[in-house]
Amino acid sequence: MNFDQLTDEQKQQLYLQHLQQQQQLQQQQQQLQQQQHQLQQQQQSYHLQQQQAAYQQQNQAQLQQDDSYMDEDTSELINQPPVQLDHGSPIRQQPQMSAFMPSPRFAQSESFDNHLNVDPNNTERFTSMDSMNFQPPASTFTQLGNGSSTNLSEISSGQNSLLSNHSVNNLPTALTSDTSPPVQQHPQFQPQQQQQQQQPQQQQIFQQQQQQQQQQQQPQQSRAVVNQSVSTEAANSDMTGSNTKYVYFERKPNLLSKTTQDKAASIKLTLENYYTSSVSHAIERNQRRLELENKIANEDIGSSEERKNRQLQNLGKKESQFLRLKRTKLALEDFHTVKVIGKGAFGEVRLVQKKDTGKIYAMKTLLKSEMFNKDQLAHVKAERDVLAGSDSPWIVALYYSFQDSQYLYLIMEFLPGGDLMTMLIRWEVFTEDITRFYIAECVLAIEAIHKLGFIHRDIKPDNILIDNRGHVKLSDFGLSTGFHKTHDSNYYNKLLEKEPSNTHLQPNQLTSGRNSVMVDAIHLTMSNRQTMQTWRKSRRLMAYSTVGTPDYIAPEIFIHQGYGQECDWWSLGAIMFECLIGWPPFCSENPHDTYRKILNWQESFQIPEDVHLSPEAEDLIKRFLTSAENRIGRYGGAEEIKQHPFFRGVDWDSIRDVQAPFVPRLSSMTDTRHFPTDDLASVPDNPAMSKAMEQRELDAKNGGGRKNPKEDLPFIGYTYSRFDYLTRKNAL
């Protein structure tokens, strides 16, 4: 096995397996050594008793045979307990004493034994623990914990003389006693004198080895302790080896470079998004399985088991196909641009055709740099989440989303009927029946958004699209919010360490941000229909510009006093007013007056006397354009609005199946006659868009993307693929 070819994960697993084997082996050695030590104590006690009895019998026999032994009084020596004996005692020289004291074999034991018989002229001795008082150490193996600074390579290569306490205490030792009286040795103990002479040499060598070990461990232990707050008890436990060793680390990310911190944050968000999306996909997959099983269970009893199993197998194939196709990376080069059908401050909308399948889509392109500079990160994330989380027929469908170094791409369904603003420019005023139809469908569309937990906050005729059958769908969720942390600008300000932006709008403040509600001054007279038509065309151009449209925004959004879903109903009331009367309720000659009128709606709002409305229509408009506390739909939601008399006779369940007042006539699937593409010629190109396109081409040639990982943090997890569309035949 080539170690260099292994991955980091395999290396880590191999290291952990090796470490576990070493720990198990050390535990087995510890148990074996403890058993040997217990047996050793028992045998030592037994042999010591036998040797003491034999020694007493021999002395008594010598005293009876030779009176020369009586020159010294040995009765006191014989009566002493067998502890703390001097090195010259015959008991210390018995071969049985050392036969049951094997030392445990460690990594350095062989090299240690090789140095035992050196320097025979050295007579220096050292004292050790007496065998009768010997206690086994608490830890009989070299522990490699977090607190140990021992290097495994040093142990295996023999560079460090590391011995456990047990191996030290089990070495043959002798006690010296300069004051003990000399005792004449029996002739049978003479052969053991050579071993007695070698023991002081062994003791000296061991003492030197122990000193070297302590000197080597001191700098290693000082390097292992990182945190100065380690307690004295923990330090003592490290010296004795009786407790588990720990190393305390203090996190100091500020000491790292800014690039390293950005990379760490990018990895953190990537992992968070990966596991979050994995769990979400697993839940959706299980939900689809349960829905199919419930559908099969509710079918006729006569359905065969083969048919049911075939349906389950087809679902499994779709799931496998989805996982494969989901890993297919899309790029701008996979699409052919047919025509640009919309422009804005942060990007544009194109009619595109996928090269391999020929399918037609609407591609919304957003410039990343403008998202940063104009503080639109939260808005673009909210828009993507709304489109990805919805399968409602009232919301434009999102099929794919992807990104490159410069742009974000949203691949959506193409709605060839244009938008409601185009219809207002063409027809000027709607009848109450036509208004009832479109307002009723808008109620259902806004209800679908609210059920997803989002607030649109930018309901206006430009964002109400018409499909090929003439029915309504909502789009452009750039100002929507789901009250999620990623839909809050402060989240990205903290992520990117930016100063919080001041989003409070002032009457005399003109800004180019998406939150802006200011428009260019337009001089008009309310009684002049021709001037109103000019205003509408100018309004269309403002939709392409960097300024927003304040005419449909609720007053509570301006003053930042807190708002809820009821702010969308205010916008719907303003649209209803424009459909029946011909202009927005707070339209003024300049943006400052529009702003002031909305804030002072109690004095500025009025229905023209020359316009005749039904009492039901007038009442509904007034209940829409009122304070948030009294606004219709605040407490009862869409159901409360559906019960209003103005919608009497509306079939809410099948309204999408009825004939629409206007059905677009199309000559081809790429027909864009209902989009004001001619007006786009007068809209100048955004210099940032041109610069970004050049940078994108340069990045493609160099084979790389953004060099700063910090700029990619807000866009992690932006890629999306829809299951029900991707699993269709030839979806890609």
From Swiss-Prot:
Residues 281-310 form a coiled coil. SUPFAM superfamilies: beta-sandwich domain of Sec23/24, Protein kinase-like (PK-like). Keywords: ATP-binding, Coiled coil, Kinase, Nucleotide-binding, Phosphoprotein, Serine/threonine-protein kinase, Transferase. The active site is at D458 (proton acceptor). Residues 111-240 are annotated as: Disordered. GO terms for molecular function: ATP binding; identical protein binding; protein kinase activity; protein serine kinase activity; protein serine/threonine kinase activity. GO terms for cellular component: cell cortex; cell septum; cellular bud neck; cellular bud tip; hyphal tip; incipient cellular bud site; mating projection tip; nucleus. It comes from the Eukaryota. Residues 335-647 form the Protein kinase domain. GO terms for biological process: budding cell apical bud growth; cell morphogenesis; cellular response to heat; cellular response to neutral pH; cellular response to starvation; establishment or maintenance of actin cytoskeleton polarity; establishment or maintenance of cell polarity; filamentous growth. Residues 160-171, 185-221 have a biased composition (Low complexity). Residues 119-159, 172-183, 222-240 have a biased composition (Polar residues). Its main location: other. It catalyses: L-seryl-[protein] + ATP = O-phospho-L-seryl-[protein] + ADP + H(+); L-threonyl-[protein] + ATP = O-phospho-L-threonyl-[protein] + ADP + H(+). PROSITE patterns: AGC_KINASE_CTER, PROTEIN_KINASE_ATP, PROTEIN_KINASE_DOM, PROTEIN_KINASE_ST. Residues 648-730 form the AGC-kinase C-terminal domain. Interacts with MOB2 and BCR1. PANTHER family: CHROMOSOME UNDETERMINED SCAFFOLD_135, WHOLE GENOME SHOTGUN SEQUENCE (PTHR22988:SF76), MYOTONIC DYSTROPHY S/T KINASE-RELATED (PTHR22988). Serine/threonine-protein kinase required for wild-type hyphal growth and transcriptional regulation of cell-wall-associated genes. Involved in the biofilm formation through phosphorylation of the master regulator of biofilm formation BCR1. This is Serine/threonine-protein kinase CBK1. It comes from Candida albicans (strain SC5314 / ATCC MYA-2876).
